[in-house]
Amino acid sequence: MNTEEHRTPVVWRPQHRQAEFMRRPEPEALYGGAAGGGKSDALVIEALRQVDIPHYRALILRKTYPQLSDLVDKSQMYYRRAFPQAQYNATAHVWNFPSGAKIYFGSMQYTKDRTNYQGKAYDFIGFDELTHFEWEEYSYMMSRNRPTGPGTRVYMRATTNPGGIGHGWVKARFITPAPPGTPIVEEYTVRRPDGTEQKLQRARVFIPSSIFDNPALLQNDPGYLASLAAMPEAEKQALLYGSWDSFSGQVFTEWRNDPAHYQDQRWTHVIAPFAIPKHWQIYRGFDFGFSKPFSVGWYAADEEGRLYRIKELYGCTGRPNEGLRIDPVEQAQRIREAEQNDPVLRGRVIHGVADPAIFDESRGESIAAMMERSPNFLHWKPGDHTRLAGKMQFHYRLNFDADGRPMLQVFNTCKHFIRTLPNLVYDESNVEDIDTRQEDHIYDECRYVLMENPISPPARRTALPPPDDPLDLHRQARFYRI
């Protein structure tokens, strides 16, 4: 017998970084960062891992159904060659395998669409372009990720590029906590029916990829690398280099956080804390939240009108965009305690400005009135809620002058401001405003303070200083038009 004639053909062979992603044991893994790393191929193939098990069920998701077409095309190319007897039902969007296993393709255009999966169970769930999803959608599907029968491995996988409505929570969950390839382990406490507590752990990991991890693409399309390099700077940083700090759709592209300049306060919006002079005016901004986080920020104004965010109180559980569910009186108590316990704020005259919605009396006593009662005595002034004007005040203040000084700077202790502001993206429908589905509570609270202290547009936008170039490579570079 000629073994060459009967050798099984190779349908798909993973490249190095794809193989690294596919061999990870963690229940959650994110693959991606830059464009061209072969992310979608790896996700489509990973779903095949258990199709020999009759009761195996898998689900691959994109935000909208039209976006699924590329994934379905990939499945048509790979699945039919690997399993000639497998059949795709275009009406139900499901692959049926000879064993009885099924791989579904689904979408979740709106958060309410998650109920379409209520009561379902999937051994494998894959998200393509995870940053297009909100945390509530992803976390809900974690509850659908459960065994459909004995012997299956239960896990979730996702791929993505930076940018999108979910950029902030994806970055916070997978990118920030640990270096790439390092397991992120969280511990949870569960109270059992008998009253005892059980400690549980769950791990996740981020595996980066880029076009440089996909030699097959570089060989087949040498011009693709040049196409990425020619993109606008924000898109190039995200799609070519996988930067999570600069991406398409980012609202405040001016934002800079440079620890090298925390002390001299030049060319950075984040600075080291310093003593606040007694004569500087102090403002307190407030955005109420119950199921979503509430936000309080304290600002000091210097003689030039520059604002410094010197302290913050952010009412979140630690999960993305999830509030503490505490009432206005308790929020007022926490704000008052924060001011009494802070030597910079204690005894100061503080001007409070808040979301005008807290003055609404249509359903009884207003939130503002509750917070002003004894013993907290917090007084608020209704803030100017003009959204686009407020957004422009952000742009004006984030602009650097010729000396590298902006008109808004933030103490590096204000972690939630630093985390959320650069992640804000534009609304796809109202393209001049930010998308309000995001974690925008700090942005809103700060906006009220900025509108209380409006400044004129800067005479001109100042370019950032050139990057450090000790080898003089940038100056010596030559660019040719082809």
Which positions does each model-derived feature cover?
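Conserved RecA-like ASCE P-loop NTPase motor core of nucleic-acid helicases/translocases
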Residues: 56-68
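Mg2+-dependent endonuclease catalytic cores in nucleic-acid-processing enzymes, primarily RNase H-like
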Residues: 297, 305-438, 454-482
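Walker B catalytic acidic pair
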Residues: 128-129
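ATPase catalytic-site recognition across NTP-hydrolyzing enzymes
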Residues: 213-286
